[in-house]
Amino acid sequence: MSVEYYLSLYAKYNSKNLDVFRNMLQVIEPSGNYHILHAYCGIKGLDERFIEELLHRGYSPNETDDDGNYPLHIASKINNNRIVAMLLVHGADPNACDKHNKTPLYYLSGTDDEVIERINLLVQYGAKINNSVDEEGCGPLLACTDPSERVFKKIMSIGFEARIVDKFGKNHIHRHLMSDNPKASTISWMMKLGISPSKPDHDGNTPLHIVCSKTVKYVDIINLLLPSTDVNKQNKFGDSPLTLLIKTLSPAHLINKLISTSNVITDQTVNICIFYDRDDVLEIINDKGKQYDSTDFKMAVEVGSIRCVKYLLDNDIICEDAMYYAVLSEYETMVDYLLFNHFSVDSIVNGHTCMSECVRLNNPVILSKLMLHNPTSETMYITMKEIEKDKLDKSIIIPFIAYFVLMHPDFCKNCRYFTSYKRFVTDYVHEGVSYEVFDDYF
């Protein structure tokens, strides 16, 4: 093993001695194989004299390691301003870009004083302010998603444009809201600096869209952004801040806050309330003056929203054919709820009955529930006609029809009903049976 290899191992040693380090350097020729300078620049709290010795020995501050990092980037990332200064004095390029197309100015970790000191150092040695754009289309300031006010204003004072957006159209407020812990105070001073709180990005999302879509609801931020944004403004996916709040199961009082600022409640908002089973929000919307009708009840049945069905039912809003749509959706719980509330099993839509659709869906469980609730003879007649017309499998309904006829003697007294029933059963019993063996006898 070369001495340079042992020098790379020494970088990991906790108690480093500068004299030992110098002795090791005396027998080393820089090879570039072990990225020695990079390794030592990445040690937190390292005495800058170690770096100075490496630089004097011939290690270049302008070479990249295997990850595309320069020593200056590494020192900036770990917030070691003394090493940053040492590298700059020895010719490190403050405008070099790593593999993410970021210059050292992008790495602004540390306290406000430390960050401002590092900015001053980099600018003093020629860092260019406005010509670096990373992979997301951000300059150094825009890439910093959670800056302090002091740092933000410091960078602006040396030439950064505060109103730029990234390649997705997101400005500083958008990007701050995407950080782990966005703060209303940060957004407030950004707004005072002229950054728009209502600007949509390329997907049509305003800052209010973003904060309303977050799992954690930052009420203070919503209150701050609410006056500047229409809560019904849709992004390109059709979502508004209001619908995003509903979709993320936000508390009703917060949704009410947005509704109170809106002059119009759209049908889309009502539909989303129903889809997400938000009867509490339906009540808020109703108090706002929105009227519901049978179409809303039908949708609630189709999506299986028991709460919304109950709310609408309590407010005398129904759909006469609700049972039919519950069968189509195959929501057994909804079927049970409607049966309990005495909804008719005799719904007929476009010639289809609830029973014929059970056969079409091959759902004997729901069929058995419906047959126990006494469909009329006319309904059963239409059911048989529909099954025969569409050539559906009769096997699951034959036992139910036989029992129905047995329990309804009047059914057979009607010539039309009885003839249809006889043909229905006879065709099923004789289906696929060949009588060719009897040809010689006739």
Swiss-Prot record:
Task of the protein: Inhibits host apoptosis. Acts by associating with host apoptosome.
InterPro entries: Ankyrin_rpt, Ankyrin_rpt-contain_sf, Multifunctional_ANK_Repeat
Main localisation: host cell
Cellular localization per UniProt: Host cytoplasm
Protein name from the UniProt record: Inhibitor of Apoptosis OPG037
Upper classification of the organism: Viruses, Varidnaviria, Bamfordvirae, Nucleocytoviricota, Pokkesviricetes
Single biological process term from Gene Ontology: symbiont-mediated perturbation of host apoptosis
Similarity annotation: Belongs to the orthopoxvirus OPG037 family.
Pfam family, one: Ank_2
Positions of ANK repeats: 67-96, 100-131, 203-233, 237-267, 292-321, 323-347
Record text on subunit structure and interactions: May interact with host caspase-9-Apaf-1 complex.
Cellular component, GO annotation: host cell cytoplasm
Inducers of expression: Expressed in the early phase of the viral replicative cycle.
Domain of life: Viruses
Keywords attached to this entry: ANK repeat, Early protein, Host cytoplasm, Host-virus interaction, Modulation of host cell apoptosis by virus, Repeat
Gene it is expressed from: OPG037
